Amino acid sequence: MSDVASQIIELRPILPFAYARSQQILLLQRENDASLQTICVAQTPPAALLEARRIAGCSLRIERVTDEEFERQLVISYQRDSEEARRMMEDIGNEMDFYTLVEELPDSDDLLDADDDAPIIRLINAMLTEAIKNKASDIHIETYERYLLIRFRVDGVLREILRPQRKLASLLVSRIKVMAKLDIAEKRVPQDGRMALRVGGRAIDVRVSTLPSNYGERVVLRLLDKNSVKLDLELLGMSERNRQLLDSLIHRPHGIILVTGPTGSGKSTTLYAALSRLNASERNIMTVEDPIEYELEGIGQTQVNTKVDMTFARGLRAILRQDPDVVLVGEIRDGETAQIAVQASLTGHLVLSTLHTNSALGALSRLQDMGVEPFLLSTSLLGVLAQRLVRTLCSDCSQPQPVDPVQAEQMGIAPGTLLHNPVGCPQCSFTGYRGRIGIHELVLINDDVRAAIHRSDGEMAIAQILGGSRTTIRQDGLNKVLAGLTTWEEVIRVTKEE
């Protein structure tokens, strides 16, 4: 390593990498005397310099460098020094930081030609560690003509992390395919796999998806951190009313309960929390899933396998011969599965499942479109929970401000009402948000709604029947805005179809 690189690594960066890169500014603190140094380029926005000064709390010594020099110093300067990061890096036997490892990797274009693939393994371990530390749900590895792009999805939003040298693409992709037991020679078709890892002493399930593109394969890693999942209804962010109503529904002896929402809206977590609540020695609880995301002790879990014709419908039929009390169907995707689920609920089983619809009432028409007769649906359905995930405000930097009249009118609140707004600080990577919380709409199927379903009434007619007893998903979001948990912009972002 060069003397200049060694000197830079002695400096600890204060700003998150993504912010430092996008604003082209480095705020560095020397380890031994805590002095600060700022490195930027000619195009660095004045606002970024002011933000660096605000964070530092003092005047700064600014050094302007060329774009090329800034990129080099950006990569080699990022050392993670938190206790958690050090512990996790030690656990995986990795003495260097993710960004430094990228700089230090050997110049090899083909993993199969390398005598030692330990450096690339360390890089993947460091990348996974970095993703877990940032609470990322997905890692995107994208190959373009001139560069390789690595992005993390954090709190539902993609965030650029690093642009390593282009030649690392084949190294990373090949090694990941080996770890996921995929065919490394096959680069023409998409492949799916999974791997179970321990990173920093934590059990991580990783779903791997590869896709050919015009400049090489793209890879997406879905991270399932078994230590971070909240399998408790009281920890899902539901209002007290919705939580109590859902708790009463799942303790009914038979019927269907559905959870709806787009991909990544937390449906599986809600269902797992419900199963954990019901899990007891006197109940036989069984699931059919695609895939099994989290293993639940005391619950029989079966995974769909289309290669051997093990579909949701076939798995559900087999489960019903296993004397179950409660059945979880990971997703109702077709009419056959829907019909079997309805029949199961009518023969003394409690059935939990998910549907990809935008609203709770949309689940009713979707099931009828799948061929479920209205009289069967009205008899079997207990309730539908629609949900989304919104980012929560960072508790370290959010600030209350009076809402302007235009937004107040949109929200239906009094002008001047104090609402918390995102600001941005190092704790939240300058996004203003940290973590996510659910917003929900729970529709209970009462006698009036059953009669409407039996008559094949539309969603609007059923909404009128529910009237004021129904709290829509957007109204629940507004309640969380008023409580200072999130922002109206976040609620609108995830409920645009409302």
From Swiss-Prot:
ATPase component of the type II secretion system required for the energy-dependent secretion of extracellular factors such as proteases and toxins from the periplasm. Acts as a molecular motor to provide the energy that is required for assembly of the pseudopilus and the extrusion of substrates generated in the cytoplasm. Its EC number is 7.4.2.8. It is found in: Cell inner membrane. ATP binds at G261, P262, T263, G264, S265, G266, K267, S268. One of its GO terms (biological process) is protein secretion by the type II secretion system. Zn(2+) binds at C394, C397, C425, C428. Forms homooligomers; most probably hexamers. Interacts with OutL/GspL. Keywords: ATP-binding, Cell inner membrane, Cell membrane, Membrane, Metal-binding, Nucleotide-binding, Protein transport, Translocase, Transport, Zinc. PANTHER family: BACTERIOPHAGE ADSORPTION PROTEIN B-RELATED (PTHR30258:SF27), TYPE II SECRETION SYSTEM PROTEIN GSPE-RELATED (PTHR30258). One of its GO terms (molecular function) is protein-exporting ATPase activity. One of its GO terms (cellular component) is type II protein secretion system complex. Its cofactor is Zn(2+). It is an enzyme of class 7 (translocase). This is Type II secretion system protein E. It catalyses: ATP + H2O + cellular proteinSide 1 = ADP + phosphate + cellular proteinSide 2. The lineage of its organism: Bacteria, Pseudomonadati, Pseudomonadota, Gammaproteobacteria, Enterobacterales.
